[in-house]
Regions:
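Charged, low-complexity surface segments at secondary-structure and domain boundaries
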Residues: 1, 23-27, 176-178
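Terminal amphipathic helices with adjacent charged low-complexity linkers/tails
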Residues: 1-9
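A general, composition-driven signal for non-globular sequence regions
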Residues: 8, 15, 19-22, 119, ...
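Active-site diphosphate/adenylate-binding microenvironment
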Residues: 12-88, 94
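Thiamine diphosphate
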Residues: 51, 61-255
């Protein structure tokens, strides 16, 4: 297989198994936002030379596959260290050295709290940073680990198991940073629309903004490695699993 054949094969897989599925789209229900719908909106409304920062947790798994880097965009994250709270302080350095480009820092509610003091630096320098909080009301990655590998003994990962978060709107107000709440497609508050399409307006604002995206508490990160018949499957065979026939058909080498 030559280079072009490999590229064609990869594009075939991207078309056959798109990351963004129809059922992930926001709707008029009370269901929280799907993480992939939020990232799809970032793809749609981010600028051609925006710099996107990814924190640890859900965004570090979903971001590399769901974000479609375009034109001169950059996606910067720290997967090797996976340190919670990295995105906000890192975005400060990027903003100060990028000639006032728009910086989009995507973080979880747990990671955001790890370096919340950096908001004072962002406000003081009026940095052009948009902080998107993927608010799943806790430590989703830690909770998933506890459920999968510790027989569902979950502790310290949500308000139900000993973890509390502040009211983010009041936190933003205390730093004099504009705040937006995004719940679902049909959400209105005081006559103002707060759906994901609101990101088009938010990304055009000069200066810092905090955006609180209310997301699913039990978000599945797909595709992912999982136990298959009691054994860890390989990177070529990830959940949701294909049939043996389809897997063999799509492989470029013989199993």
């Amino acid at each position: 297989m030559n280079k072009q054949e490999w590229i064609d094969k990869c594009n075939h897989w991207k078309t056959k198994w798109p990351v963004m599925q129809k059922e992930y789209e926001a709707d008029d229900s009370d269901t929280p936002l799907n993480l992939y719908a939020v990232l799809d909106a970032v793809n749609k409304y981010s600028g051609r030379d925006d710099i996107i920062m990814g924190d640890a947790g859900s965004i570090s798994y979903a971001g590399p596959v769901a974000l479609n880097r375009k034109y001169d965009q950059r996606f910067v994250f720290s997967p090797a260290q996976a340190d919670m709270g990295w995105a906000v302080p890192a975005s400060i350095g990027v903003a100060l050295s990028s000639n006032d480009k728009n910086v989009i820092a995507i973080t979880g509610d747990g990671s955001f709290m790890s370096n919340v003091q950096e908001l004072s630096v962002i406000r003081h320098h009026c940095l052009n940073i948009k902080i998107l909080i993927l608010n799943n009301r806790g430590y989703l990655s830690i909770k998933n680990t506890q459920e999968k590998y510790f027989e569902n003994r979950v502790y310290g990962t949500s308000d139900k198991t000993g973890l509390e978060f502040p009211v983010f709107s009041k936190l933003a107000e205390s730093f004099s940073i504009p705040y937006y709440l995004i719940k679902n497609k049909g959400d209105y508050e005081n006559g103002v629309f707060y759906g994901l399409d609101r990101l088009q307006h938010i990304f055009a604002i000069e200066g810092p903004v905090i955006v609180n995206c209310i997301c699913l508490e039990n978000q599945e990160i797909l595709p992912s490695q999982a136990l298959k018949n009691g054994k860890q499957a390989g990177l070529h065979d990830m959940a949701p699993f294909l049939s043996d026939e389809e897997l063999q058909e799509e492989m470029v080498v013989t199993l």
